[in-house]
Amino acid sequence: MVKSADLDLMNSIISESDENFSPPPFTVEEAENSINNKSSTASLESPQNGSWHPSLYGLSVPEKTHIQNSLDLYSHGNSGSQKTHNVSFSCEIRKVKSSKLSPISNMEDSEDKKEEDESSSYKNEFKSSSSASVSSNFEKTSGSDDHNSQSPVPLNEGFEYIASSGSEDKNSDEEFAVEMILDSRMKKDGSGFQYYLKWEGYDDPSDNTWNDEEDCAGCLELIDAYWESRGGKPDLSSLIRLTRSRARSSNEASYVEKDESSNSDDSISYKRRRSRNAANRITDYVDSDLSESSMKEKQSKIEKYMKSDKSSKNFKPPFQKKSWEDLVDCVKTVQQLDNGKLIAKIKWKNGYVSTHDNIIIHQKCPLKIIEYYEAHIKFT
């Protein structure tokens, strides 16, 4: 018969063997089984379900048998004091559990803690690399954007990923494409051209913008096609020379010594007003669009008012050439249309005659038109 003192001692030994785990205490029936039954598993098995006592979860059969033998030694020992058996049994349980295998509950806690530490370490490493990558991207892209430079991050189940900076900065890195060039003009300081651009995906005319030529490096093909459709890009230096020479000749004409016989304030005022209008017309040309429509369209409009000579019906002016100075013999006439535009008829050295918008003449043969104006100027 198991005494209550012995039962308490057995339970205290098993509880002390695992400080982090509190198994159900032995019952009197279980304790008696451990004494009366000599099998290697009877004493520490639960009689309810036939499984090992919870204090021994996680131990192998040999280890459980070793503890069983210690319990038998304590219960039926023929040598040594009760205290010696007590210490021996307690030490055996502690030794086996600490050096061999931990209880399943402790093993699960340990594995959970290990996974948590690995996950925490992985998250910190990912956040560090992500922050460094975002910082590097920010320094590079004050717009340009190379999101593909970042190394791919391996997937990990159960991990809550941080949003990539690439998706957040998608709008800031959006690229704008030029759909077409609508018009062009010379800059006021004469340093180059400006182009009137229509942007792809923006159909509202208010979205069209004027941009300097040096800012249009991304649409050089459109610029080349634009000038090709207009007979070639005008020479900037010739336009500047034309502007200066026209302004100078206008100023000279306005201050020509007047004839003493017709010395009136009205005539002086008229000459100055006419020369000022001519200068303003050149200035307006420089500041305004060089081509409000293509040269071919202008040519068709001009031919409505003035037909070329029959001998020039099949003649095609060399619009691809930058200058016509060596090809044109002279400017024959200059006329003004109903809409205020000036057109000039020129004679080519090969004998052909053709009519063109005065702006084209300024671009292609400015010296010829100056010679015409000088030949027809009248002093009063």
UniProtKB/Swiss-Prot annotation:
InterPro entries: Chromo-like_dom_sf (IPR016197), Chromo/chromo_shadow_dom (IPR000953), Chromo_domain (IPR023780), Chromo_shadow_dom (IPR008251), Heterochromatin_chromo-domain (IPR051219). Residues 176-238 form the Chromo domain. Its main location: nucleus. Residues 33-52 have a biased composition (Polar residues). Residues 121-140 have a biased composition (Low complexity). GO terms for biological process: chromatin organization; heterochromatin formation; pericentric heterochromatin formation; rDNA heterochromatin formation; regulatory ncRNA-mediated heterochromatin formation; silent mating-type cassette heterochromatin formation; subtelomeric heterochromatin formation. GO terms for molecular function: chromatin binding; DNA binding; histone binding; methylated histone binding. Residues 14-58, 100-156, 250-273 are annotated as: Disordered. Residues 108-119 have a biased composition (Acidic residues). One of its GO terms (cellular component) is subtelomeric heterochromatin. Keywords: DNA-binding, Nucleus. It is found in: Nucleus. The keyword Nucleus applies. It comes from the Eukaryota. Component of the kinetochore which plays a role in stabilizing microtubules and so allowing accurate chromosome segregation. PANTHER family: CHROMOBOX PROTEIN (PTHR22812). This is Chromo domain-containing protein 2. It comes from Schizosaccharomyces pombe (strain 972 / ATCC 24843) (Fission yeast). The lineage of its organism: Eukaryota, Fungi, Dikarya, Ascomycota, Taphrinomycotina. The gene is chp2.
